[in-house]
């Protein structure tokens, strides 16, 4: 039987979260916390395009999930005074799906494609002339008698978001003049995000409570807000309605999020690499089978944090547990062979 992990520290949006995220989403560049260099650059690009009355160049936003790529797209549309059209790679199954979106765009509108690395090859190829020449090619008929009809499109901006830049085909990636990678947030930035969100939710919050939540939010705003919601529940039912350090600590212990921000699935991954595979190296598919999760989910959701925090290493031969993983789980490294990093 597959045991599903607790999902409170999963950086991907859960069902029903979109509405809350929209209510807490920053409305302007000045409201956006963190990613200072990226925001400063994009602010200049947007202002220049607006002054010239042109569409903004196509933008590719990459980085781990939950860091604010969608929020940046919304802010761009608002700053440019245009409409944002939102879709995702998996939703664009055939060329007709893309055609319907492109032909509905007004001049300078933004088309936001989340998970753009998951576009089908046919849709991706149809996107090339749309991005370069603002046209969409429609094939009429089949075989030798087939003809291509060009549909002219309004000049628009494509904003693509991806967590897996390496899965993007080079011809697609190279068609984005503006490419920015979002990085994990520091504790001070996450604290500010938590305090702002608590204020919007009408939740009194202590400084040390916000600091503790930020410290254990895996560098990800979406996780910080999710944990804030759960802490609000505990503060309301088992406390005096105020978010204190004690309330946050009690909440996260109940959610099995430890002092370093690792959850039950993180610990299962590390335990599998150490106990089942002798510390590695071991392939991602083997680890996924051992913990009962899809390998893509491990690569997108869990591994980036474990690698960044020094618990796990990705090597040409597979995943290897690092000394911090042994120490965190209380394992003796002499109990099994330690894999080579080369």
UniProtKB/Swiss-Prot annotation:
Reactions catalysed according to its record: ATP + H2O = ADP + phosphate + H(+)
Head domain (RuvB-H), as annotated region: 259-342
A Gene Ontology molecular function term of the record: ATP binding
InterPro entries: AAA+_ATPase, AAA_lid_4, CbxX/CfxQ, DNA_helicase_Holl-junc_RuvB, P-loop_NTPase, RuvB-like_N, RuvB_C, WH-like_DNA-bd_sf
Source organism superkingdom: Bacteria
Chain intervals for the UniProt region annotation (Large ATPase domain (RuvB-L)): 1-185
Gene Ontology terms: cellular component: cytoplasm; Holliday junction resolvase complex
Pfam families: AAA_lid_4, RuvB_C, RuvB_N
One record GO biological process: DNA repair
Residue span of region Small ATPAse domain (RuvB-S): 186-256
SUPFAM superfamilies: P-loop containing nucleoside triphosphate hydrolases, Winged helix' DNA-binding domain
Location (main, coarse): cytoplasm
Annotated Mg(2+) binding sites: 70
Binding site for DNA: 314, 319
Disulfide bond positions: none
Location(s), subcellular: Cytoplasm
Family per similarity comment: Belongs to the RuvB family.
Protein name per UniProt: Holliday junction branch migration complex subunit RuvB
Organism whose genome encodes this protein: Anaeromyxobacter dehalogenans (strain 2CP-C)
Gene for this chain: ruvB
């Amino acid at each position: 039987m597959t045991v599903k992990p607790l999902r409170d520290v999963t950086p991907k949006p859960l069902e029903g979260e979109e509405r809350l995220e929209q209510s807490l989403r920053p409305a302007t560049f000045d409201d956006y916390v963190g990613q200072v260099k990226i925001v400063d650059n994009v602010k200049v690009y947007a202002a220049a395009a607006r002054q010239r009355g042109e569409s903004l160049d196509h933008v590719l936003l990459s980085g781990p999930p939950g860091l604010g790529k969608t929020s940046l797209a919304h802010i761009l549309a608002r700053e440019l005074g245009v409409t944002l059209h939102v879709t995702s790679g998996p939703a664009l199954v055939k060329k007709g799906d893309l055609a319907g979106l492109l032909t509905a765009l007004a001049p300078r509108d933004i088309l936001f494609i989340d998970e753009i690395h998951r576009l089908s090859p046919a849709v991706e190829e149809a996107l090339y002339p749309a991005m370069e020449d603002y046209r969409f090619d429609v094939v009429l008929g089949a075989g030798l008698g087939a003809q291509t009809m060009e549909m002219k499109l309004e000049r628009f901006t494509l904003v693509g978001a991806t967590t897996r830049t390496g899965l993007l085909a080079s011809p697609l990636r190279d068609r984005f003049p503006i490419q920015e990678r979002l990085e994990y947030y520091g504790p001070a930035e996450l604290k500010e995000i938590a305090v702002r969100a608590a204020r919007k939710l009408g939740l009194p919050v202590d400084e040390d409570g916000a600091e503790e939540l930020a410290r254990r939010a895996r560098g990800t705003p979406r996780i910080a807000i999710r944990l804030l919601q759960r802490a609000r529940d505990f503060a309301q039912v088992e406390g005096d309605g105020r978010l204190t350090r004690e309330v946050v600590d009690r909440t996260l212990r109940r959610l099995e999020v430890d002092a370093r921000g690792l959850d039950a699935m993180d610990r299962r991954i590390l335990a599998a690499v150490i106990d089942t595979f002798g510390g590695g190296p071991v392939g991602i598919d083997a680890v996924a089978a051992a913990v009962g999760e899809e390998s893509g989910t491990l690569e997108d959701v869990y591994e980036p944090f474990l690698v960044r925090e020094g618990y796990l290493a990705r090597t040409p031969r597979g995943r290897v547990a690092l000394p911090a993983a042994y120490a965190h789980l209380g394992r003796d490294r002499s109990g099994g062979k330690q894999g080579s990093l080369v």
